[in-house]
A protein has these predicted regions:
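Non-catalytic, mostly N-terminal accessory regions of nucleic-acid modification and defense proteins
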Residues: 1-169
Length: 169
């Protein structure tokens, strides 16, 4: 039990450290409310990406594929094999290429990261259209304006800097 509490404390401290590092990186360029909405939206995106990956990985491992990693499969395979039942179970769907971990891997080379993120957020919200979760997912990322010039400099530079410095494991 003590080990679990210590691990949670360590994770919380790491999260606080990352949030302060992000704040230092964009301090002055964004007012507090916009900053909070942006960071919380990105953190939520990371959470649901990790959550859906673990959901698929656990199911595949239970079925006997101990080396399966959803993040490593093609979008086409995900569409065919996973999308049909996922929105019913999870309330949303994210393609492997749209997962936070894959976006981070490619952030340094992606000159369109800000618009790609906006499209990913729209796709996540759109994945619930026609399902019971539609109202809960609709507008979820509307406060995360990745094209806003309030982030200072160029948006792509700010977002790329955020991912490169603050989102690696």
């Amino acid at each position: 039990m003590a080990k679990l509490v210590n691990n949670e404390t360590t994770q919380r401290a790491e999260l606080h450290r990352k949030i302060w590092a992000i704040a230092d990186n964009v301090r002055g360029a964004v007012d507090g409310w916009d900053f909070k909405q942006y960071i919380l939206g990105i953190l939520f995106y990371r959470f649901i990406s990790e959550n859906i990956t673990e959901f698929f990985n656990a199911a595949e491992r239970e079925a006997g594929d101990l080396t399966f990693n959803y993040a490593d499969i093609s979008d086409e395979e995900a569409e065919k094999d996973f999308r049909p039942y996922t929105v019913e179970d999870k309330g949303f769907f994210i393609l492997p290429s749209q997962l936070f971990e894959n976006v981070v891997k490619n952030a340094a080379d992606n000159e369109n990261l800000n618009t790609d993120l906006a499209n990913i957020f729209k796709a996540i919200e759109g994945s619930a259209v026609g399902f019971a979760s539609e109202d809960a997912i609709k507008g979820l990322f509307e406060d995360v304006d990745t094209t806003s010039n309030r982030l200072g400099g160029t948006v792509a530079e700010k977002i790329n800097g955020y991912f490169k410095r603050n989102c690696r494991n």
